[in-house]
Amino acid sequence: MATLLAWVGVSCCELAEEDFLAVSPLDPRYREVHYVLLDPSCSGSGMPSRQLEDPGAGTPSPVRLHALAGFQQRALCHALTFPSLQRLVYSMCSLCQEENEDMVPDALQQNPGAFRLAPALPARPHRGLSTFPGAEHCLRASPKTTLSGGFFVAVIERVEMPT
């Protein structure tokens, strides 16, 4: 991750190699966190290179997909509990709606009125699947529509900072 961040010019971040779900948002190291890039483990169904290596890798089993989606939901909801959080980017290299669009409304409902979706790269034409109000703010790519790897991005921002 450090190599990727340096490659794209990110210099104002701190990486922590910990179990994210075990991190306390009130820990002095994290209570002033304003921005989170959440890229949890996923099926990788949007990664064409995985499918070339293993043709069966493109479609996860329902059991694996359910387990991954559960973990992703816990991670997303946990990230939204950081008291100073202003903006979160949720990204997936998956084509599965269960890992992408289905995560967003559930997380927003856990924090009613505290967060909203912000447009993710609004100039890009390919948006999230219309599965919930606001999905048009999400970004979705796939080998079929964008001739790229598959991915999903949702930008969630705090409506009002806590006092």
Curated annotation (Swiss-Prot):
List the InterPro entries hit by this protein, alphabetically.
Answer: MeTrfase_RsmB-F_NOP2_cat (IPR049560), MeTrfase_RsmB-F_NOP2_dom (IPR001678), RCMT (IPR023267), SAM-dependent_MTases_sf (IPR029063)
Q: Where are the transmembrane segments?
A: none
Keywords of the record, alphabetical order, are: Methyltransferase, RNA-binding, S-adenosyl-L-methionine, Transferase, Williams-Beuren syndrome
Claim: Lyase is one of the keywords in the record: no
Enzyme class, broadest EC rank: transferase
Example of a GO biological process term: RNA methylation
The protein's matches in Gene3D superfamilies, at most eight in alphabetical order, are given as:
Vaccinia Virus protein VP39
State which Enzyme Commission number(s) the record gives: 2.1.1.-
Q: Name one GO molecular function term.
A: RNA methyltransferase activity
Superkingdom of this entry's organism?
A: Eukaryota
PROSITE patterns, per database record: SAM_MT_RSMB_NOP (PS51686)
Q: Which tissues is this protein detected in according to the database?
A: Ubiquitous.
Record's PANTHER family? Answer: 28S RRNA (CYTOSINE-C(5))-METHYLTRANSFERASE (PTHR22807:SF4), NOP2 YEAST -RELATED NOL1/NOP2/FMU SUN DOMAIN-CONTAINING (PTHR22807)
Task: Give the similarity note.
Answer: Belongs to the class I-like SAM-binding methyltransferase superfamily. RsmB/NOP family.
Q: What is this protein called?
A: Putative NOL1/NOP2/Sun domain family member 5B
Q: Which organism is it from?
A: Homo sapiens (Human)
Q: What gene is behind this protein?
A: NSUN5P1
